[in-house]
UniProtKB/Swiss-Prot annotation:
This is Probable tyrosine--tRNA ligase, cytoplasmic. Gene3D superfamilies: HUPs, Tyrosyl-Transfer RNA Synthetase. GO terms for biological process: tyrosyl-tRNA aminoacylation. Homodimer. Belongs to the class-I aminoacyl-tRNA synthetase family.
Length: 342
């Protein structure tokens, strides 16, 4: 192979990696695109995604899971953080006495989801937050970070993620500082999360340098709206389709979604846009093929797709995605009961 061919091949590999890393993202924070390129020219990007151990994961988790698959295919060094301590810091969404059981639940279901989309989990590092967040160096850095941040700083940083209340708990204020420190202690170049994490990401960019640590890259995927609300949330049963929901429960939830003929403000269309079209390259609704959400929306707005047909197709595709995950999880009923007391 001559020198020109080698250069062209390296350029092709570089561009493929950049495309995989950046596609389907909602936002990459300012100036970070160029930093990504500088790193990729030298070595593989180190990136982490953290998930707080709270309510049961839902179909909205397919968004980060599919993006993680992209990162792995781009040869990034990917770390997944199971943030168990964060789970109870956030207004005790996960009771302390259940946190260990819920960690095992999350670890299993996230790995099953990754395998269900064809991601090689052997190329991912899985970390439990409490395995390093109780170490003396981490805790002392947390004290130092708290000396630089005010109540207002931390309350603002967590306002889109941490549950808000009139008398804010100190634990909720610690949450953003710990998430900032995780970037340093996981030794990564970048943190990936939903766009609801933006204020925490900016908090990290502002305050980590005060401890002498570098600013990290931040990548954000869009947040999936709830079935009948602004955000699909693990802690809001009415907003989500749980990954353990039965076929009948899934059908019922989708059938109850607002879906007026010709009206694009529908939770059913959101499921197609944020989940189904990220999973499938082509779908069929009433025997017609579609390769983009834009085409589905166009036909629905023109009343060429009836709400009943839209809901039926939505239910069918979600059930195909969820059924193998549910079946695998139900092999360990005892683990589920211990995690969620039911």
């Amino acid at each position: 192979m001559d020198e020109t061919s080698i250069i062209n091949e390296n350029t092709d590999v570089f561009e493929k990696k950049i495309t995989l890393i950046e596609r389907n993202l909602q936002e990459i924070t300012i100036n970070d695109k160029e930093i990504i390129r500088k790193i990729i020219r030298k070595r593989n990007l180190k990136i982490y995604w953290g998930t707080a151990i709270t309510g049961k994961p839902h179909i909205g988790y397919f968004l980060p899971i599919l993006k993680i698959k992209d990162f792995v295919e781009a040869e990034c060094e990917v770390t997944i953080l199971f943030a168990d301590i964060h789970g109870f810091l956030d207004n005790l969404k996960a009771p302390i006495e259940l946190i260990e059981n819920r960690y095992h639940y999350y670890e299993k279901i996230i790995k099953i989801m990754l395998m269900s989309v064809g991601c090689d989990i052997n190329k991912i590092r899985f970390v439990k937050g409490s395995d390093y967040q109780k170490n003396s160096d981490y805790v002392f850095d947390l004290y130092k970070l708290c000396s630089y941040t005010t109540e207002r700083d931390c309350k603002r940083a967590g306002s889109d993620v941490v549950k808000q209340r009139d008398n804010v708990l100190l634990s909720s204020l610690i949450y953003p500082n710990m998430q900032a420190l995780d970037e340093e202690y996981l030794k990564v170049d970048a943190q990936f999360g939903g766009e609801d994490q933006r204020k925490i990401f900016m908090h990290a960019k502002t305050f980590l340098p005060k401890l002498g640590y570098k600013k990290r890259i931040h990548l954000m995927n869009p947040m999936m709206p709830g079935l009948n609300s602004d955000k699909m949330s693990s802690s809001d049963e009415l907003s989500k389709i749980d990954l353990l929901d039965t076929e009948q429960q899934i059908n019922k939830k989708i059938n109850k979604c607002f879906c007026e003929e010709g009206n694009l403000q529908s939770g059913v269309l959101h499921v197609f846009e944020f989940v189904i079209f990220h999973y499938y390259t082509s779908i069929s609704i009433n025997k017609k093929s579609y390769t983009s959400i834009e085409d589905v929306k166009k036909d629905f707005e023109m009343k060429l797709i009836h709400p009943k047909d839209l809901k039926l197709a939505c239910s069918n595709y979600i059930n195909k995605m969820v059924t193998p995950i549910r079946n695998e999880m139900l092999k360990d009923i005892d683990m589920i009961k211990k995690a969620y007391n039911n």
